[in-house]
């Protein structure tokens, strides 16, 4: 598995002329909830305009692209790791596990997997063979399939935080999405934590006296 600092779509021909899955994650930093990943195989005959790193897009644009990706992609799949798995494995290994779950859930086997960042887990095809994979630094702004994966993962997790906000409105999840903001710390100090919190994360451990 190689790591690239930059890579163009044309460069992909050096790796594969077949199906390419882009993979990205969201939610490594929050104190609460799953870490969410997505794997997307785009259809070259149905290009999607405006794909980019989800963090650089407005919420309205992400939502519109989410629907377009779901409609036009050959296939996509969300993978996740729970707070309990994060606490057991650590956030890095839980993220790798979630990525593996996303790729394993694709109903079309990719010939190449491209992962945003500087590392990639081992991906295995349905027949047990190891899939070729490469990590690409800032790939979510370089490779369309990774951009699409970042959008699917981001919108999915944000929606889950909205659901959590409806159940626990006193925490403000709809605004901070579970990240360690001042408002979130104040809510934790007043109301404590519940089972969706990541107990291995330092601010939560400190509150629980662990």
Swiss-Prot record:
Residue ranges the record marks as coiled coil: none
GO terms for cellular component: cytoplasm; ribonuclease H2 complex
Known cofactor(s): Mn(2+); Mg(2+)
Enzyme Commission number(s): 3.1.26.4
PROSITE patterns named among the record's database cross-references: RNASE_H_2
Entry note: cofactor: Manganese or magnesium. Binds 1 divalent metal ion per monomer in the absence of substrate. May bind a second metal ion after substrate binding.
The RNase H type-2 domain, residue ranges: 18-210
Family affiliation: Belongs to the RNase HII family.
NCBIfam families: PRK00015.1-1 (NF000594), PRK00015.1-3 (NF000595), PRK00015.1-4 (NF000596)
Functional note: Endonuclease that specifically degrades the RNA of RNA-DNA hybrids.
Protein name stated in the entry: Ribonuclease HII
Species this protein is from: Shewanella baltica (strain OS185)
Organism ancestry: Bacteria, Pseudomonadati, Pseudomonadota, Gammaproteobacteria, Alteromonadales
Designated gene of the protein: rnhB
């Amino acid at each position: 598995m190689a790591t690239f600092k930059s890579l163009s779509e044309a460069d992909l021909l050096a790796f594969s002329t077949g199906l390419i899955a882009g993979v990205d994650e969201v939610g490594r930093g929050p104190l609460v909830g799953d870490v969410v990943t997505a794997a997307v195989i785009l259809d070259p005959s149905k290009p999607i305009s405006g794909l980019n790193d989800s963090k650089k897009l407005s919420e309205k644009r992400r939502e519109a692209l989410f629907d377009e990706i779901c409609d036009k992609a050959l296939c996509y799949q969300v993978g996740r790791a729970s707070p309990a798995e994060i606490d057991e494995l650590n956030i890095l290994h839980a993220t790798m596990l979630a990525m593996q779950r996303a790729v394993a859930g694709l109903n079309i086997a990719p010939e190449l997997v491209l992962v945003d960042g500087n590392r990639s887990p081992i991906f295995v095809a349905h027949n047990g063979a190891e899939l070729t994979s490469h990590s690409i630094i800032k790939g979510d702004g370089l490779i369309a399939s990774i951009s699409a994966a970042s959008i699917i993962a981001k919108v999915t997790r944000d929606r889950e935080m909205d659901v959590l906000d409806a159940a626990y409105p006193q925490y403000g999840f709809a605004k901070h999405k579970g990240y360690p903001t001042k408002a979130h710390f104040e809510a934790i100090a007043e109301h404590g934590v519940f089972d969706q919190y990541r107990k291995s994360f330092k601010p939560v451990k400190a509150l629980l006296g662990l």
